[in-house]
């Protein structure tokens, strides 16, 4: 079932998924109750479980990469290692499309540098990403939110909003939210 059909069947609005505004009740979710927003999150997570994708996420402590140059260098290194370890997988495709919204210059620089270093420049296609236009951009947002929430659980740093959305039971969070994404994670 398509996500739009699932939302309609549940009487939920069909709005482009964006985790932070959804969780905090900002536009375009401002007029929706928390329970409605949680149902929308559940519908989107259900879509993510069924969607055919593989992913890899990276997380860094600010204190370990305070300087922008240090972050860019470390992220590039980690991307190069990941891409090299998975080169056979990526070489199965004629084109590797990179959708990114250029939101953070350091991330953009590391992505371009690592991908251009490991993969053939003719094989990499860069595209601007928009949550309104590309559902995979929304999937990435959901994955990042779940992975960040996992880190917050591990460090006992849940916010009040995190607790309202995901609860405070870490095993339940892992079972109900995180494990479905982890199955799609590339090593």
PLM regions: where:
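Phosphate-ester processing/binding pockets and catalytic centers
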Residues: 1-187
């Amino acid at each position: 079932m398509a996500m739009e059909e699932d939302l309609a069947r549940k009487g939920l609005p069909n709005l482009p998924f964006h985790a932070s505004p959804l969780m905090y009740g900002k536009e375009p979710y401002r007029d929706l109750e928390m329970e409605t927003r949680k149902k929308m999150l559940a519908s989107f997570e259900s879509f993510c479980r069924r969607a055919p994708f593989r992913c890899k996420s990276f997380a860094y402590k600010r204190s370990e990469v305070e300087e922008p140059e240090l972050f860019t260098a470390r992220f590039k290194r980690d991307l190069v290692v990941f891409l090299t370890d998975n080169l056979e997988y990526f070489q199965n495709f004629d084109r590797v499309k990179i959708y990114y919204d250029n939101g953070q210059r350091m991330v953009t620089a590391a992505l371009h540098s690592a991908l251009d270093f490991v993969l053939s420049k003719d094989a990499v296609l860069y595209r601007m990403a928009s949550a309104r236009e590309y559902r995979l951009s929304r999937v990435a947002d959901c994955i990042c939110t779940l992975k960040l929430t996992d880190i917050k659980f591990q460090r006992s740093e849940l916010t009040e909003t995190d607790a309202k959305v995901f609860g405070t039971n870490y095993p339940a969070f892992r079972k109900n939210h995180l494990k479905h994404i982890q199955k799609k994670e590339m090593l």
